[in-house]
Amino acid sequence: GLNQGVDFVGGRTYQVRFAQDISASEITDLLSKPEVFGSADAKTFGDANQLKITTKYKVNESGAEIDEEIRKSLYEALVPHLEGTTYEQFIDLNDENKQVGLLESYKVTPTIADDIKQASFWAILGSLIVVFLYILIRFKKWQYSLGAVAAVFHDVLIVLGVFSLTYKFMPFNMEVNQAFIAAILTVIGYSLNDTVVV
């Protein structure tokens, strides 16, 4: 299967900067303890002292008090790595000169994630239909259209297959998110150009 990002399954994402370079696996283990979030994923994001932390903890619950509870749990778990940063400093997203603490946070609910999945599916399907119609009108043979769409679909299938087979082994982030969908649409564009022009 594919490693679906927060955009597609729902969850909370936090971008945190630390005082020193930090091990993503150490933070993942720390936040995955039952008394913290139960499960979390941390990945190096940009510099070696910055992590992107994702969790599905209480994703179905909403409200300011839940968000506050989760930020406090995050802070309390990370405080040994924050070099004297107070909770107020940690959560202040308006400080542009912040050296340590929370830089960004957002939440995607499962409902929004389902909407994004559907929109992505329709975007890819729509592009294949447009390709089919363009070639049908341009070359006046449905067989050419079918062949071109099959070639484009084949190219997309190869990219999806490579992602599906290798995301666990790669040392970098290979999650399926909105940027991945944009990349798939780019593959469709290049494949179409190669099929029709060449």
Specify the residue positions occupied by each region the protein language model found.
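A structural signal for conserved, well-ordered secondary-structure elements
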Residues: 1-198
